[in-house]
């Protein structure tokens, strides 16, 4: 368990308001048998320093910090145990855009310095592109497509992925792109549709004349293209290059980090 830690989405709800930072970060160390208070406090202070916070913050409470600082405390809590894998559950979605870039760049620096592996969960595809090496796109709890980040963003081969990428805002006002607006309501994950889970909202199926195979046969992930690119679509080859080119546009993520932590 020590080798796997998590950074929670909500920096306001994931920290116990009744506990000082020293105990919030040190709780995991205590659970793993680090009973010496001096050793534990030293590890806590080191963890705070690593994420860009002052060592003397250990006696403060969560309400004394900003959202960005609270998320740094959450990151320090995860790092204190020396994990190999860190699950990042939407770690910047609750933060202001100006703070998001700081936290993302911090996570990238920590990955490099401590040789970490991240499982990064996000709905922001611009952030995913900036942050990830490989990407898996899920729909109703199942993988729809996965692959190298550059390959998948350049040549998506699942209709759902194409629709998601079409929704990324384009910062260039001179460039026009077509957005694929999905029809219908999202089905319940507890009672997903038969066959392909996306068939009730799939623009490609409608374009192909609503083939019955999408309803009766669940598609399995299969190789398509290079770099371990796989997709779960019976008609992935029909996702034409013209459609992909007209909808795929990526948005640059703020990469400048302010010197002082938020």
Give, region by region, the residue ranges found by the protein language model.
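Short catalytic/signature loops enriched in Gly
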Residues: 148-260
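ABC-type ATPase nucleotide-binding domains, specifically the catalytic core motifs of the NBD
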Residues: 19-39, 52, 147
């Amino acid at each position: 368990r020590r080798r796997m830690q998590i950074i929670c989405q909500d920096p306001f709800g994931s920290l116990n308001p009744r506990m000082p930072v020293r105990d919030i970060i040190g709780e995991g160390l205590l659970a793993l048998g680090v009973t010496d208070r001096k050793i534990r406090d030293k590890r806590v202070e080191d963890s705070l320093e690593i994420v860009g916070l002052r060592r003397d913050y250990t006696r403060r409470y969560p309400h004394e910090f900003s959202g960005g600082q609270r998320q740094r405390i959450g990151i320090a809590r995860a790092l204190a145990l020396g994990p190999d894998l860190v699950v990042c559950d939407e770690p910047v979605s609750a933060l202001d855009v100006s703070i998001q870039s700081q936290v993302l760049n911090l996570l990238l620096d920590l990955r490099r310095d401590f040789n970490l592996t991240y499982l990064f969960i996000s709905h922001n595809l611009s952030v995913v592109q900036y942050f990830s090496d490989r990407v898996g796109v899920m729909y109703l709890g199942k993988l729809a497509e996965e692959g190298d980040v550059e390959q998948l963003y350049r040549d998506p081969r699942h209709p759902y992925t194409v629709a998601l990428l079409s929704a990324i805002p384009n910062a260039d006002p001179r460039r026009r792109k077509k957005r694929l607006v999905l029809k219908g309501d999202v089905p319940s994950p507890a009672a997903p549709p038969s066959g392909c889970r996306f068939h009730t909202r799939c623009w490609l199926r409608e374009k192909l004349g609503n083939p019955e195979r999408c309803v009766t046969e669940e598609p399995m992930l299969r190789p398509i293209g290079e770099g371990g690119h796989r997709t779960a679509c019976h008609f992935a080859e029909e996702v034409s290059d013209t459609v992909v080119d007209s909808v795929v546009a990526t948005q640059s993520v703020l990469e400048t980090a302010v010197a002082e932590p938020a």
